Amino acid sequence: YTVDKIRIADANLYWQVSSSLVGSRTSADIVGKNGEVIVKSGKKIGQSAYDSMIAAGITEISVKIEDLTGAYTLGDLVNTSDGEVIAESNTELTAETIAKLIEAGIGSLEIFFPDKDDVGSTMSATVRKDAIKSSQEALIEIYRKMRPGDPPTLDTSQSLFHGMFFDARKFDFSRVGRLKFNIKMGRPERDRLEDPLLSPLDFFDVIDYVLKMKRVTGEQKTRDGRTIFYSDDDIDHLGNRRVRAVGELLENQFRLGLVRMERAIKEKMSIHTEMQTAMPRDLINAKPVTAAVREFFGSSQLSQFMDQTNPLSEITHKRRLSALGPGGLSRERAGFEVRDVHTTHYGRICPIETPEGPNIGLISSLSCFARINEFGFIESPYRKVVDGRLIDYVKIINPGDTQYKPGDHVPEEEAAQVNKQLGEGKKPATHEPYPFYQSAWEEDKYIIGQANIEVDANGRIIGERVNARQAGEFILATRDEVQFMDV
């Protein structure tokens, strides 16, 4: 919640100027240092009036208790002389409470307005109603909810909660999970990618996001400078669906085999009589691992004989995508939405090549130029447009005697110019065409023109306005607005 500070002096209340004042009414004229009335008594404080107050250097304004309707105390208000709690945290501020504070000689307090705040009153109301006041009680209550039949103890509750989120052997947020979380929370995309566990800040961000979703839509800046976009997620958007390749599926099965093998080894170690002379072969049996791998390739729902009628059918079979299988959908439960063509399929999944019958829309094929990135998201290639001009980029393979480094991405014209300026006997840089690959959520940020836009010999877009798309919607954009173009 946004916290406001109230100062009490000579039985009067003074509200420290903050953004919470916007929308509230004044009980007295707000006057600047030069005597000019910024806001008249009884009028609402608008954003422009608030900006004028800041510019005039006004730090606090006089208010009445009626102006603080809907305010709640942030912390416990304690009488320092006798230790009496005048008002507990998260209780509504009343005239009676203020009178007690004045009597006790308390000079300031911190308040918040749940109904005015973007977070809403849900959090405040929940904390007020919640009878559990300590972390130990909370852990035991979580254990009761998760394991209804078992008698809860503090130790078992702590171990269960720790295992759910903070034990790397039992919980793995995964690199792709951290990537998507960072994007959603406005953090740098590759921040803490290798960290498999959640931090307290992660929990705070999730709760804050979910509570604000009721009131906030679109972009909003956070207190620490991040930009978060509040919107409902589309489950069929290819930014929220990823390809799980055979290596990842096999890794999961292999892990299960290793867990079974570990259990068998521990059992043997507990009953083995001569541990001092025991050899690894006496304790380790690799059958659970090999059985898991064989079961995966032999009887998995996704395991198929490759279509080798000809090289083309072989390639087609290898490029096939399936929404079925373990962890996926079933033909019976899959609805119309998941089978339908989505706007993000453009350039990624072929909208035509899908079987008829119960598998329609669940089995599909990659588009010609699509590729799968390291996180499993399908990417589509684009050509860059700068100030209404199409610029082809190249990737440096061998820099030769130029100043480039292998892997550099530079405009093709620039690379040709640098090679031309090399003296005799100098080795030119070799390069290959470089398209800009983007995933579905990256594509949503840009205005992308169609591949058939007319350009002149210098790559300049001829038309003043062209057909383009942005975040799945088709629009008419000026040539200078276009940032990328389809291949």
Which residues does each predicted region cover?
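Intrinsically disordered, low-complexity regulatory segments
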Residues: Y1-V487
